[in-house]
Amino acid sequence: MQYTEIMIRYGELSTKGKNRKDFINRLASNVQKVLHDFPDLKIQTHHDRMHILLNGTPFEPVNDRLKVVFGIQTYSPVIKTEKSLEAIEKTALELMQATYKAGMTFKVNTRRSDHKFIYDTNQLNQMVADYLYNHMEGLQAEMKHPDMVLLLEIRQDGAYISNQLLHGAGGMPVGTAGKAVMMLSGGIDSPVASYLAMKRGVNIEMVHFFSPPYTSEKALAKAKELTSILAKYSGRINFIEVPFAEIQETIKEKLPEGYLMTVQRRFMLRLADIIREKRHALAIFNGESVGQVASQTLESMSAINDVTTTPVLRPVATMDKTEIIAKAEEIGTFDLSIQPFEDCCTIFAPPRPKTKPKIDKAREYESRLDVDGLIERALAGVKVTPIYPGQSFLDDLDEEDADLL
């Protein structure tokens, strides 16, 4: 049976008071963006619901896109009909006949925002259920845990009937919390942190440090492909490449081994902060988890954060590694994250880094370096690439390699 539209129920938008309209408009824009290649769809927004008119478009391919849009609490494919008992009963029967299977239990659940409608919710539940019993064989009612719930919603403009209540991605529409930069490595943690930042409405741009010839083109392609996976949640993400080899070489040559990691991270944070300012962003996100590695002790974080007053936010800070891995598997980044391409965080990793570095020591060692010159030359090599959902980078690189053989 052909659904006529999709009814979307907002999540936390219902609590946003005077900003509610802006949040709803942003959600509509994000939905429009992910459904841009379905020309027959039409989006209508209301204060408590959004409607996507399908106009003949099948529900399933639209559902595949819609389920990853942040800001949607639940949604249902519905059939809209006129607000009369006869039309409601007829449409309910057609939907049940098309989807009900022998042995399933069901119940009718009615909501009514039009309180002037002649029947109340209990009456509608009973009358529609009786009608179905009289026109179908073998129906079994179950009030607590039915296999199918027939949803009726009586609104001012008509009656909406569905047999599915689907859970959306939740959270806030991407863009409603402003823009930030994300320090993206090629590992497991930072893609999960990116997902969680977007879920809170943050529009993120990826900052990725690479160090050719020490890091390969495949390591860079891997980071871009991780960004492509995450882009399905926002429609597009800008990927910012920052060359980092000269800085790493200089630090390794001139500073004590125990402070290599701390000073490298301080340079990364400086660069991310300058890029943030140039990109008109408000904060810096990363994938650090407290105590997971030497650079992620509170003492290390404090010594690294010393170079900026910009908020540095860590969405996975209190998560166990097993929790982060589970989320990475859920969002589809795990298998790619564990591909063995070394990134710049691992190639110069000292065997015995300081786990409790001192801020004054880090400052003293940096005074031996041409910090401004190193930063300036790294920024001169920055490259920005817009990345879209579904783009492939590793496969394209493999094809280029094959062409050379």
UniProtKB/Swiss-Prot annotation:
It is an enzyme of class 2 (transferase). Its main location: cytoplasm. It comes from Lactobacillus delbrueckii subsp. bulgaricus (strain ATCC BAA-365 / Lb-18). Residues 60-165 form the THUMP domain. Belongs to the ThiI family. It is found in: Cytoplasm. Catalyzes the ATP-dependent transfer of a sulfur to tRNA to produce 4-thiouridine in position 8 of tRNAs, which functions as a near-UV photosensor. Also catalyzes the transfer of sulfur to the sulfur carrier protein ThiS, forming ThiS-thiocarboxylate. This is a step in the synthesis of thiazole, in the thiamine biosynthesis pathway. The sulfur is donated as persulfide by IscS. One of its GO terms (cellular component) is cytosol. The keyword ATP-binding applies. The gene is thiI. ATP binds at M183, L184, H208, F209, R265, G287, Q296. Pathway: Cofactor biosynthesis; thiamine diphosphate biosynthesis. HAMAP family: ThiI. This is Probable tRNA sulfurtransferase.
